[in-house]
């Protein structure tokens, strides 16, 4: 599915009747959250609020509210397409030389797709059609949402934060929430291990910290492919802009900022330009994807020097809360992306599942074709290590390939019948944990547990292992033939 920018993607959604324009005045203060929450829980359309109360700028919400729309944003039609993308990412991470003609034919489409991965630098761009600086910089002109009753204030949620470390060749793009504290100041909430925070730390430890200020740009209303690229486990040597071009089948056009050399998506609706210094402020509390309000913490203040916009710009926002919300829907879609990456490293993996009700990543379930003693433990350690996204996974449940890991009833049966709590659990202390996980004993440091719910082999148990009950196939087929005639239901 080919498109250029957010506006052209909205036209695609309109063509397929997957977006709704709401002309009734609705307040960005709590009301849009409630409407979006009800809509997403019924797998409803994306929403454009044409008249947010008190604002002239429309507000887009619930863009990624179904896995189908996530797939469309990534260039496909449905979630099956995302599995194919996972194979491309797996190839890009660890490319292999072709061994025969069949391998060459299989690789060719991948290289064809890569032709869109080169960025195109432009001198004029829609995102700079209107430029505001100095006293004209005013975030209060944007319908930034306050999502939950106890939130401290308005919160920017879908901004793509663009940074570059002093010794890096390419930029980093991350999605971090930002609290508005003044008309030209926001708090940059990023965790220490995230790319933007690492760039800032590197800058503070460099000579440049004494010579200049650390530039930051935030793209609001970027094209959906670039947004999703910022939350996708792409190879470290591949830029988000390049991967976005692959997704939307169009090269990403970028333009240099007004106030710095940072390059931003040319078709973004709004760009915030500014700088960080050593000033910090208390951030929060805010309702988060866990379904709870987070603690108040101190983070850097971003001073905004310029706002550039498209004419008739649109503000793109979301809310986060107890699943189901947009992050959990994106997590469901990206789950399909992870599977080929994991299978490339561990071919014995049959399926992998991140239940959306578990805050996207805190519990994972995997099914394997068991091959040797202790196999489940090896898989646990591998999953915790292979991708940064799984660093915060607290629970890993490993099942045999006869278990449908997308079905909690099957999982619970497997745990209740194949697990001895002492023998089949792997506990690890003092591991990285999500800063928002207040259940951990310490901030950023907690424990993990792996549960081996596979059938145990001789050497893993001294007892005779149970044989699962199954009906004969002949009988099942016979009853299938007469089932409708029985009129039981």
From Swiss-Prot:
Q: Which residues cross the membrane?
A: none
Keyword Cytoplasm in the entry? The reply is no
Q: Where is the catalytic site?
A: 288 (proton donor)
Q: Name where it's found.
A: Cell membrane
Enumerate the UniProt keywords alphabetically: Cell membrane, Decarboxylase, Flavoprotein, FMN, Lyase, Manganese, Membrane, Metal-binding, Ubiquinone biosynthesis
Name the positions where Mn(2+) binds: 172, 240
Quick one: which residues bind prenylated FMN?
175-177, 189-191, 194-195
Q: In which pathway does it act?
A: Cofactor biosynthesis; ubiquinone biosynthesis
Entry note: cofactor = Binds 1 prenylated FMN per subunit.
The protein's topology relative to the membrane is: Peripheral membrane protein
EC number(s) given by UniProt = 4.1.1.98
First-tier enzyme category under EC = lyase
InterPro entries per UniProt: UbiD, UbiD-like_C, UbiD-like_N, UbiD_bacteria, UbiD_Rift_dom
Q: What does the record give as cofactor? A: prenylated FMN; Mn(2+)
Keyword presence, Membrane: yes
Which transformation does this protein catalyse, written as a reaction?
a 4-hydroxy-3-(all-trans-polyprenyl)benzoate + H(+) = a 2-(all-trans-polyprenyl)phenol + CO2
Q: Which Gene Ontology cellular component terms are annotated?
A: cytosol; plasma membrane
Question: Which PANTHER family does UniProt cross-reference here?
Answer: 3-OCTAPRENYL-4-HYDROXYBENZOATE CARBOXY-LYASE-RELATED, FERULIC ACID DECARBOXYLASE 1
Q: Please report which protein family the annotation says this sequence is part of.
A: Belongs to the UbiD family.
NCBIfam families membership: PRK10922.1, UbiD family decarboxylase
**Function summary:** Catalyzes the decarboxylation of 3-octaprenyl-4-hydroxy benzoate to 2-octaprenylphenol, an intermediate step in ubiquinone biosynthesis.
Report what the protein is called. 3-octaprenyl-4-hydroxybenzoate carboxy-lyase
The gene is: ubiD
